[in-house]
Swiss-Prot record:
GO terms for cellular component: endoplasmic reticulum membrane; Golgi apparatus; Golgi membrane. The gene is RAB2B. One of its GO terms (molecular function) is GTPase activity. It is found in: Endoplasmic reticulum membrane; Golgi apparatus membrane. This is Ras-related protein Rab-2-B. The keyword Protein biosynthesis does not apply. A lipid is attached at C208, C209 (S-geranylgeranyl cysteine). Pfam families: Ras. GTP binds at residues 13-21, 61-65, 119-122, 149-151. It is a lipid-anchor. PROSITE patterns: RAB. SMART domains: RAB, RAN, RAS, RHO.
């Protein structure tokens, strides 16, 4: 399917926060409760529509283990957007956000759009991080913020699409040189009048989540 733009995303965060589950829910609209841990990097893609234009999202799901951080860092380059994910039931995953963000700021392009996602909001009875804390962290660091549930699909679509909307606005505002693919944006060849639809393409699972 033709697209007006292709945006490259990376999903980052600690092991077990649900990165792979978020990707699978977005691309395949299903939840897989038991996964093998992601080894290195896995990939998914899906078409969405923004401003009546078909946009292809190419999403790289990364391993959260420290031993894979060097591999993950290489994927920051050439990413237009990132989902930085923590688990609202595990305080330590929130505490590690600053380290992930430092990595992103150091290795990614300065205009990369970052969406902070507090995953597993379906387990709010086990909450260890308040909504306000997530919101405050995002505000302090210039991130977009949303709580989501890969299990129930709450806000999963919105997290990916809102990130794409912010990237698209930056293109409209002339922030990106779209001829430079190192920004994680590729100009496509959209067929006039064709809508992007919400059809999904291939994705592979991985990671561990509730």
């Amino acid at each position: 399917m033709s697209y007006a733009y292709l945006f490259k995303y990376i999903i980052i965060g600690d092991t077990g926060v649900g990165k792979s589950c978020l990707l699978l829910q977005f691309t395949d609209k299903r939840f897989q409760p038991v996964h093998d841990l992601t080894i290195g990097v896995e990939f998914g893609a899906r078409m969405i529509t923004i401003d009546n234009k078909p946009i292809k999202l190419q999403i790289w799901d990364t391993a959260g283990q420290e031993s894979f951080r060097s591999i993950t860092r290489s994927y920051y380059r050439g990413a237009a957007g990132a989902l930085l994910v923590y688990d609202i039931t595990r305080r330590e995953t929130f505490n590690h956000l600053a380290s992930w963000l430092e990595d992103a700021r150091q290795h990614a392009n300065a205009n990369m759009t970052i969406m902070l996602v507090g995953n597993k909001c379906d387990l709010s009875h086990r909450r260890a991080v308040s909504y306000e804390e997530g919101e405050q962290f995002a505000k302090e660091h210039g991130l977009i913020f949303m709580e989501a549930s890969a299990k129930t699909a709450q806000n999963v679509e919105e997290a990916f699409v809102k990130t794409a909307g912010a990237i698209y606005k930056k293109i409209q505002d002339g922030v990106f040189d779209v001829s430079n693919e190192s920004y994680g944006i590729k100009v496509g060849y959209a067929i006039p009048g064709q809508s992007g639809g919400a059809g999904s393409s291939s994705s592979q699972g991985g990671g561990c989540c509730s």
